[in-house]
């Protein structure tokens, strides 16, 4: 495993740990999700470029499309929750009441 793959794996792991440990605010959870998606994009792009898979070259672009949709939905949910409840704490949100 090369050094760049190990760095991207560490970035993914740190983002995942940040998502699991610091779940107090919705904005920090969204930032951790974006870090995970970015590290996945870089790892997939490097793997496809190193193995010369031309048929799979669209997969990182599709991942970026899903990441953009996830970011837009997450930010719209953040705006809706913060205007409705006046806070963005994840612990105080209940999916059955929202």
Curated annotation (Swiss-Prot):
Keyword Transmembrane helix: yes
Keywords: Electron transport, Membrane, Mitochondrion, Mitochondrion inner membrane, NAD, Respiratory chain, Translocase, Transmembrane, Transmembrane helix, Transport, Ubiquinone
A Gene Ontology molecular function term of the record: NADH dehydrogenase (ubiquinone) activity
Superkingdom: Eukaryota
Transmembrane region(s): 1-21, 29-49, 61-81
Single GO BP term: ATP synthesis coupled electron transport
GO CC annotation: mitochondrial inner membrane; respiratory chain complex I
EC number: 7.1.1.2
Catalytic activities: a ubiquinone + NADH + 5 H(+)(in) = a ubiquinol + NAD(+) + 4 H(+)(out)
Cell location: Mitochondrion inner membrane
Main location: mitochondrion
Membrane topology, from the record: Multi-pass membrane protein
Role according to the record: Core subunit of the mitochondrial membrane respiratory chain NADH dehydrogenase (Complex I) which catalyzes electron transfer from NADH through the respiratory chain, using ubiquinone as an electron acceptor. Part of the enzyme membrane arm which is embedded in the lipid bilayer and involved in proton translocation.
UniProt subunit comment: Core subunit of respiratory chain NADH dehydrogenase (Complex I) which is composed of 45 different subunits.
Family from the record: Belongs to the complex I subunit 4L family.
Protein name: NADH-ubiquinone oxidoreductase chain 4L
Species of provenance: Vampyressa bidens (Bidentate yellow-eared bat)
Gene that this polypeptide is encoded by: MT-ND4L
């Amino acid at each position: 495993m090369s050094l760049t793959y190990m760095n991207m794996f560490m970035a993914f792991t740190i983002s995942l740990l940040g998502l699991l440990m610091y779940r107090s605010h919705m904005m920090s959870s969204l930032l951790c999700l974006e870090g995970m998606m970015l590290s996945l994009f870089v790892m997939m792009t490097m793997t496809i470029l190193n193995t010369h898979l031309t048929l799979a070259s669209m997969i990182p672009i599709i991942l970026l499309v899903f990441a953009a949709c996830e970011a837009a939905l997450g930010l719209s949910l953040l705006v809706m929750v913060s205007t409705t409840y006046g806070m963005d704490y994840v612990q105080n949100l209940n999916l059955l009441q929202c």
